[in-house]
């Protein structure tokens, strides 16, 4: 590419205002790129439950310059306690601290995380437009001409598809690529008052995998992965009772907690689907990141982490190269193997729980994941 430096005279367009899109906006603004983020949801809503963030995410937040505000919004912990299906503790896995003076891991509410990232992206100078999607785009030598769903148009140097597992951008760029695949499992989530002294992630093994994650000093959330043959639809009315029933065969401590699941509106249910693009994640001036390229199951708690790391690496490579082709190729080389490991290792746990593969030792898998993600990106 010749002429003006990309992202300087014309902005970079980020499609998707979730975790990956917002961290991309912050990272790009740090490098001096002009950024516009569009998000299809006019309310910019997120699930009201929590999310697990591992040590590599805390390191990334430090690189983004927002670590202290981020940590203050959640609950830190350094240990994963693993329990057998009957409730007996079988392992205690210490997570590595990658930053002195900060916890190894963090549980944080998704709304709190959205607030930290959205406020930080705007403060960094990113333009964020809500209730807008891409209607069409044309690519030429000097950039992209994009038409939006609100009738407006714009010129951009690069388009980043950070629009999730059902990515509109992926479908447009790679129409022949396989779509998301249902795993046979779903995840249920629900918030509870915190347990005194609960300063670890507690993970329960079994056909139904359950975890308890602190997200503030007085709040935690429960997640449960359940077999869901045929990918059924559950009506919202009565879904709290359905979730309670799913936990009826779990450890006594989980059954006792389940009695508090009474609010249908508080239940978050999501079928688990995965996708892993083994070919390039880019074509021309369009590039994918996060779930749009490599959606994983939550068994290792690294889906958001991989998207955040993608954002940092992509911004770095765009700053280091004079052409989009060179930058995108370098980004893909650095990210593909790491993201594929997370997708495959998480899916192996899922298949083991479903009886479709060998049972995976969760403590061993978690320790291995900590070691892999502690490595520089």
PLM region spans:
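Conserved Rossmann-like nucleotide-cofactor binding loop
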Residues: 20, 43, 166
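Conserved mid-domain beta->alpha element of the FAD-binding
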Residues: 13-38, 160-161, 243, 266-352
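Flavin-binding catalytic cores
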Residues: 235-268, 332, 337
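C-terminal auxiliary extensions adjacent to catalytic cores
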Residues: 366-377
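Conserved N-terminal helical subregion
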Residues: 2-12, 54-174, 178-185, 189-191, ...
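Active-site substrate-recognition segment that forms the wall
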Residues: 190, 198-232, 236, 240, ...
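Residues in the short beta-alpha loop(s) of Rossmann-like NAD(P)-binding domains
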Residues: 41, 50
